[in-house]
Amino acid sequence: MPHSYDYDAIVIGSGPGGEGAAMGLVKQGARVAVIERYQNVGGGCTHWGTIPSKALRHAVSRIIEFNQNPLYSDHSRLLRSSFADILNHADNVINQQTRMRQGFYERNHCEILQGNARFVDEHTLALDCPDGSVETLTAEKFVIACGSRPYHPTDVDFTHPRIYDSNSILSMHHEPRHVLIYGAGVIGCEYASIFRGMDVKVDLINTRDRLLAFLDQEMSDSLSYHFWNSGVVIRHNEEYEKIEGCDDGVIMHLKSGKKLKADCLLYANGRTGNTDSLALQNIGLETDSRGQLKVNSMYQTAQPHVYAVGDVIGYPSLASAAYDQGRIAAQALVKGEANAHLIEDIPTGIYTIPEISSVGKTEQQLTAMKVPYEVGRAQFKHLARAQIVGMNVGTLKILFHRETKEILGIHCFGERAAEIIHIGQAIMEQKGGGNTIEYFVNTTFNYPTMAEAYRVAALNGLNRLF
């Protein structure tokens, strides 16, 4: 690359997408700066999203496990922990992650600049620094990886101390007894699990007719039943008319005429890209109504020297995919093309209690496509390992072509689902006839393990053939 600019490339944002791009660029010898608006690297994933919510979930699930373990069932008092204590656990994990990621940049001599970036022209950024000064930076190319934030409708007062979004909920300073969660997407369902696991009353307001409609319907139904069985009140096909903050909580008026009151509200209905402060109009770029940018297969925007990755380009909005997008964009930026691409079947992990994970097609999709598939199932309660550790709730379902035996989709509900799914994913990615359900029958698994569910499910499915 010519060295007429301050940098070969500037990456805006240090979340998974920005990190993947920055590391990919410096490994190829590029002079790179990463701009981060906050004091610490890691982006929303590390500080407000994936890491803290999963740390909260882990702490709560351990409390549930203790309270339900028959070894301790004769104790007269249940184990409890305050929300503040659980948040402390999340903070410890965040600090570890931040130090580790800061080390990545330092070891690779990648410069970190703090401040808010905005485009001045096609190759120039103005950096508004924390001390009020403004620096001018130039680069031949750019990667926009500035992530997303919770969507804030204008008629909801997020300055009220009892109205939270998925970022501010991590700063809650009171102990809720009853929480309203508006939005039953992934974030809403995960926090419904967390709060209910802490014995907090939960009303989950779903604007659609079922939970997580993109999932295989059996997985969605399993989650709905588990929520119902644990005491979560789910209200489908509802939208708010008005949200009132009051001294002792929040009142929500629904368009159906219902009124709900709780100690606090978590508004978790949508996200928007952090692009509004970038002055993209100065380089001829436009976003959609959600602040997202359109890109091609190499993650180039309408300006060929400007790339975008992660939440700021929308689907799949996963930290795992964002890192790979950044790595691919780095290859394309330096070499003009990339020899890697995102896999077609990206696994989905949803960290409710229990977890849900899936990869490939659902039964509903295969039926609509008129694919002759069969189903193999394994119930966790029949696995020795699950009985030993007390994880009896759950199932693994394998969908496979009844003629070729090719695995078409895998869906798992239960503890460790997000880990278990990768065994099947590895086989699904095999080429030249390697993707076959018969692999699980012909393979010897460690015993007792949760992975054995694949053998049980494979035998169950193959026994259905005639």
From Swiss-Prot:
Record's keyword terms, sorted: Cytoplasm, FAD, Flavoprotein, NAD, NADP, Oxidoreductase
Essential cofactor(s): FAD
GO biological process, one term: 2-oxoglutarate metabolic process
Bound cofactor: record note: Binds 1 FAD per subunit.
EC number: 1.6.1.1
Domain of life the protein comes from: Bacteria
Catalysis performed (reactions): NAD(+) + NADPH = NADH + NADP(+)
Primary location group: cytoplasm
Location relative to the cell: Cytoplasm
GO molecular function terms noted in the UniProt entry: dihydrolipoyl dehydrogenase (NADH) activity; flavin adenine dinucleotide binding; NAD(P)+ transhydrogenase (Si-specific) activity
Any Pfam family matching the protein: Pyr_redox_dim
Gene3D superfamilies: 3.30.390.30, FAD/NAD(P)-binding domain
Naturally occurring in which organism (per UniProt): Escherichia coli O81 (strain ED1a)
Name this polypeptide is given: Soluble pyridine nucleotide transhydrogenase
